[in-house]
Amino acid sequence: MSDKYMKNLTFANIAKACEGRYIGDETLLDTTITGAVIDSRQVKEGYLFIPIKGERVDGHKFIPTVFEQGAAIVLSEHELTDPAGPYVLVESTTDAMKKLAAFYRKSLDIKVVGITGSVGKTSTKEMISSVLEQKYSVHKTAGNFNNEIGLPLTIFGIRESHQAAVLEMGISDFGEMHRLSTMSCPDVMVITNIGYCHLEFLGDRDGVLKAKTECFEHMMPDAVAVLNADDDKLATVQTVNGKPAIYYGKESASDVHKSVYTTNIENLGFDGMKAHFVTPEGEFDAHIHIPGEHNVYNAMAAAAVGLQLGLTIAEIKSGIEKAETIAGRTNFIKTHGMTVIDDCYNANPVSMKSSIEVLSHAKGRTIAVLGDMGELGSDEKKLHHEVGEAVGENHIHTLFAAGELAKEYAAGAAEKSSDVDIHYFEDRETMTQELLSYVKEGDTILVKASHFVEFPKVVEALSE
């Protein structure tokens, strides 16, 4: 079957997988769909349209339109009057979509790598994909399509020609990982770290560990877990489903036995990192062209996954050295004689400190422009204060901070260093105006905050 079609997703199998009732021309039951979407604007000839009930819009109202656009079949939560094509009646289109994604994934002969963790999911996904692409045709999560709506859509993008899929899985509460991993059924499951994310819902890091490791229950029978040995919580996981966990980390950072580890780590500032990698299959030196020590960890995870999926040392090294940044994730923008480090897609304490460390290697004035971090629970002030301390400890020249909790950045920075030029503002707009009059040629400016603070607007202002 060509890549035009979604293998095994006939009308009959769709109805069966969704636990729904097929209503329409019975002679079409063996028809195979060509795609599956929830956005009516993306419907093409032969597609399945899945109408989702949103807060503002109910996708069911677009059913007549999508049939005109060439949709082959739709799902629906209620019986349709004189529909222009067949449909499957289901109790919940959202639940039906998840069931269909799980069915489709299991019907494919493909190796699936799942990735989760408090920090570094997307950058690790990119590194692993870069490595696997040296041997396989790879499908990967686009953008941040990593939740209970995004993951099934990512799975629907897999075609028969793909040999590996790298799927990012993001959660904020208990039970979500159960549902995500039921759909993805990983052959290799990577957990990057257990940090201070979503503590409003998960309580503490032990809660984060419990929620993240729900994925172990839904891995494929011969699956392996690839874990960061230098994370104290993950280091307590000795076996997964009766098999030893595969660990990676720095040679001297912890006592856990590591299958993949690094020595001779060299920070090249904005030119990236160099490290010596030791694996069961051999050793190699690699130049990672993305700044930040955290990218050495991403590369170790990618090496461990590559070995599990049969890549050679040469292929792994090549993939690590070809990896690139993506927009909004430590992206470097040259503008008006300045360098803007656009890292404002999201933020948490660990990623904040990593980005500040990257900034510290810049020449000229270093300016940290920081906004609030969300979902940190009762420790939110303390965790913001610690990020401020990192600004002082890394000898950052200037701090611009905006937001209610960002006061703690200013306090922490002042506590650690009297040399930091500190500017605090209650709102982003006022801060941006002051920042524009402050910056000059030769400055390097880090812009970082949680997504809800809308700091991409700061990057836009600096770039205009």
Predicted regions mapped to residue ranges:
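Active-site beta-alpha connecting loops in nucleotide-dependent enzymes
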Residues: 56, 326, 344, 348-417
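ATP-dependent carboxylate/acyl-activation modules
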Residues: 115, 121, 327-329, 452-458
